[in-house]
Curated annotation (Swiss-Prot):
Cellular component terms per the entry's GO annotation: cytoplasm; small ribosomal subunit
GO molecular function terms noted in the UniProt entry: structural constituent of ribosome
Source taxonomy: Bacteria, Bacillati, Cyanobacteriota, Cyanophyceae, Nostocales
Annotated NCBIfam families: S16
Protein name as it appears in the record: Small ribosomal subunit protein bS16
Length: 86
């Protein structure tokens, strides 16, 4: 199963995260299928590849709870329901 989840990077105690599509059995910091965005919890900076995320969600990818909250704040789920599934 493909999951949209956070991949940690950055210095010790100064973590930043990439939002990635990965197999759910892969390591947290393993090689992703696709990088879809960036999240910095220290500054609340979020950058998303919305078309890529919408495509993955329509293909059946499941976001983790944290990624789901980030996507809800950015109104990505509204775009998923607005576009017809291909």
């Amino acid at each position: 199963m493909i999951k949209l989840r956070l991949k940690r990077f950055g210095k010790k105690r100064e973590a930043s995260y990439r939002i990635v599509a990965m197999n759910n059995l892969s390591r947290r910091d393993g090689r992703p299928l696709e990088e879809l965005g960036y999240y910095n919890p220290r500054t609340d900076e979020v950058r998303l590849d919305v078309p890529g995320i919408v495509k993955r969600l329509q293909q059946g990818a499941q976001p983790t709870d944290t990624v789901r909250r980030i996507l809800q704040k950015q109104n990505v789920f509204e775009q998923v329901s607005a576009k017809p599934a291909s």
